[in-house]
A protein has these predicted regions:
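C-terminal alpha-helical "lid" subdomain
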Residues: 3-92
């Protein structure tokens, strides 16, 4: 629907993307750091993998990284014995 007002959003900067993904992890853990399914190092590896796979789209369209992170967290929640590094390496 383009009949209404349109907001022209600038691509997210690297620090903004980092903050967004950290906050999504925090929300998924119900605001409790002890419930994080992926630690800071794992989240950093996730971001590097996304940058490699998505390239410029990683910043232009954050939906890709958001959906991928939420999918990864759902898999980790359903499979507590899953290895984070292995799952991240399988992201494509």
């Amino acid at each position: 629907d383009v009949s209404g007002p349109v907001i022209d959003l600038q691509p997210l900067q690297e620090t903004e993307m980092d903050e967004l993904l950290h906050k999504l992890r925090h929300v998924q853990a119900y605001g409790e750091a002890k419930n994080y399914l992926i630690d800071d190092m794992g989240l950093w590896q996730f971001m590097l993998q996304c940058r490699t796979i998505y390239g410029a789209q990683y910043y232009l369209n954050p939906r890709l990284a958001i959906k991928t992170l939420l999918d990864l967290l759902a898999i980790l929640q359903q499979n507590p014995n899953a290895k984070v590094a292995e799952l991240i390496s399988e992201i494509s």
